[in-house]
Amino acid sequence: MENAFKLLYKTIEERKGSPLPESYTNYLFSKGEDKILKKIGEECAEVIIACKNNDKEEVVKEMVDVFYHCFVLLAEKNIALEDVMREVKERNGKLSRVGDRREIDTL
């Protein structure tokens, strides 16, 4: 799975460095951070709707859209995928206690 993410991120970085005229990825880069963030919000809302509808196939598709748009944001912000993967590995297996987290209404 990690290789699929690496391949996707590599493609996004290539589009950023060598724009293709009809590329949706380049469209997002040309519109900037606000557009990318808006798309992430939209895709997250679509995941929520798919979950509420108990539509597993749609949840999978929408999650891929979330991953893609988040990877575009990482590239826009010049954050390496390896940095994110390192953090995932660092957190993997660690026990997190409920009391260690802030309440949602106080964020």
From Swiss-Prot:
Disulfide bonds: none annotated. The lineage of its organism: Bacteria, Bacillati, Bacillota, Bacilli, Bacillales. GO terms for molecular function: ATP binding; phosphoribosyl-ATP diphosphatase activity. Belongs to the PRA-PH family. The keyword ATP-binding applies. It is an enzyme of class 3 (hydrolase). GO terms for cellular component: cytoplasm. Pathway: Amino-acid biosynthesis; L-histidine biosynthesis; L-histidine from 5-phospho-alpha-D-ribose 1-diphosphate: step 2/9. Keywords: Amino-acid biosynthesis, ATP-binding, Cytoplasm, Histidine biosynthesis, Hydrolase, Nucleotide-binding. Gene3D superfamilies: MazG-like. It is found in: Cytoplasm. Its EC number is 3.6.1.31. Pfam families: PRA-PH. This is Phosphoribosyl-ATP pyrophosphatase. The keyword Hydrolase applies. It comes from Bacillus cereus (strain ATCC 14579 / DSM 31 / CCUG 7414 / JCM 2152 / NBRC 15305 / NCIMB 9373 / NCTC 2599 / NRRL B-3711). It catalyses: 1-(5-phospho-beta-D-ribosyl)-ATP + H2O = 1-(5-phospho-beta-D-ribosyl)-5'-AMP + diphosphate + H(+). GO terms for biological process: L-histidine biosynthetic process.
